[in-house]
Curated annotation (Swiss-Prot):
This is Formamidopyrimidine-DNA glycosylase. Keywords: DNA damage, DNA repair, DNA-binding, Glycosidase, Hydrolase, Lyase, Metal-binding, Multifunctional enzyme, Zinc, Zinc-finger. One of its GO terms (molecular function) is 8-oxo-7,8-dihydroguanine DNA N-glycosylase activity. The active site is at 2 (schiff-base intermediate with dna), 3 (proton donor), 57 (proton donor), 261 (proton donor). Its EC number is 3.2.2.23, 4.2.99.18. Pfam families: Fapy_DNA_glyco (PF01149), H2TH (PF06831), zf-FPG_IleRS (PF06827). Monomer. InterPro entries: DNA_glyclase/AP_lyase_DNA-bd, DNA_glyclase_Znf_dom_DNA_BS, Formamido-pyr_DNA_Glyclase, FPG_cat, MutM-like_N-ter, Ribosomal_uS13-like_H2TH, Znf_DNA_glyclase/AP_lyase, Znf_FPG/IleRS. It catalyses: Hydrolysis of DNA containing ring-opened 7-methylguanine residues, releasing 2,6-diamino-4-hydroxy-5-(N-methyl)formamidopyrimidine; 2'-deoxyribonucleotide-(2'-deoxyribose 5'-phosphate)-2'-deoxyribonucleotide-DNA = a 3'-end 2'-deoxyribonucleotide-(2,3-dehydro-2,3-deoxyribose 5'-phosphate)-DNA + a 5'-end 5'-phospho-2'-deoxyribonucleoside-DNA + H(+). Binds 1 zinc ion per subunit.
Length: 274
């Protein structure tokens, strides 16, 4: 599933081709994704794309005729093509945004769990209304995390994956960050110390920044807009490595379902206090 670094990579990849361009048409081949594709997309002919930015795992295509909210879902990806290429349509190519200068933004989604919605202003849309701070922003601090964790009995892994606390820390990067911080994923959030919060915030920022630089993580479906895979999978420390040796201590990486998600951790480097 594309997480924050993958969405950020997609945003950076498509922006140079689209910002400042006018929309010629939006072709919707599959109107039923996670939610029905907004009918307003058919009225955006002539709209100028002002900016493309990311909020949580949503890509916002801001235009002078309203904003398009795109979520990649479980298996979605965006590619940039030229009308001149005349590339064949894949059965999973559900939406094309075509600009007047001949650029195609093509949305491919085998599992059809993504989102293409219209809003007059994205920031006031219900989907974005109750989100926590961005993890790479100055608002996400150790003091903030410590304060939010008080009286929270939920496992710390679930806690940092809660978008109301902080956005965009998905399963892969939660596992990796907790390993780097030396924190067991089942530790109750309320038991985090101020020092642990400081370390955790630091490594979350480090892990996400590194993943963005390397183009995201390619595990199953994610491909960058230029067709290249992400490379962060090559340096994963615990995620997907059940039964393998820990790179730090040599112990065997374990896996457990926490909050309906597979969680990977080192039992020695991430001890759970008794």
């Amino acid at each position: 599933m594309p997480e924050l670094p993958e969405v950020e990579t997609s945003m950076r990849g498509i922006s140079p081709y689209l910002v400042g361009q006018k929309i010629k048409e939006i072709i919707v081949r599959q109107p039923k994704l996670r939610w029905a594709v907004s009918s307003e997309l058919s009225t955006m002919q002539g709209a100028t794309i002002i900016e493309i930015y990311r909020r949580a795992k949503y890509l916002i295509i801001q235009t002078d005729k309203g904003d398009i909210l795109v979520h990649l879902g479980m298996s979605g990806s965006l590619g940039i093509l030229s009308v001149k290429e005349n590339k064949a349509i894949d059965k999973h190519d559900h939406i094309d945004l075509i600009t007047e200068n001949g650029v195609i933004l093509r949305y491919n989604d085998p599992r059809k769990f993504g989102t293409w919605l219209w809003a007059e202003q994205a920031e006031t849309a219900e989907l974005l209304a109750n989100l926590g701070p961005e993890p790479l922003s100055e608002a996400f601090t150790s003091g903030y995390l410590f304060e939010k964790s008080r009286n929270k009995t939920v496992a710390v892994k679930n806690f940092i994956m809660n978008n109301a606390i902080v956005v965009g820390v998905g399963n892969i990067y939660a596992c990796e960050s907790l390993f780097m911080a030396g924190i067991h994923p089942e530790l109750a959030a309320q038991n985090l110390t101020a020092k642990q919060c400081e370390r955790l915030v630091t490594v979350i920022k480090e892990v996400l920044t590194k993943a963005i630089i390397q183009g995201g993580t390619t595990l199953k479906d994610f491909i960058q807009p230029d067709g290249k895979p992400g490379y962060f999978a090559q340096v994963l420390q615990v995620y997907g490595r059940k039964g393998e040796e820990c790179n730090d201590c040599g112990s065997i990486i374990e896996a457990k379902v926490i909050g309906q998600r597979n969680s990977f951790y080192c039992p020695k480097c991430q001890r759970l206090p008794k």
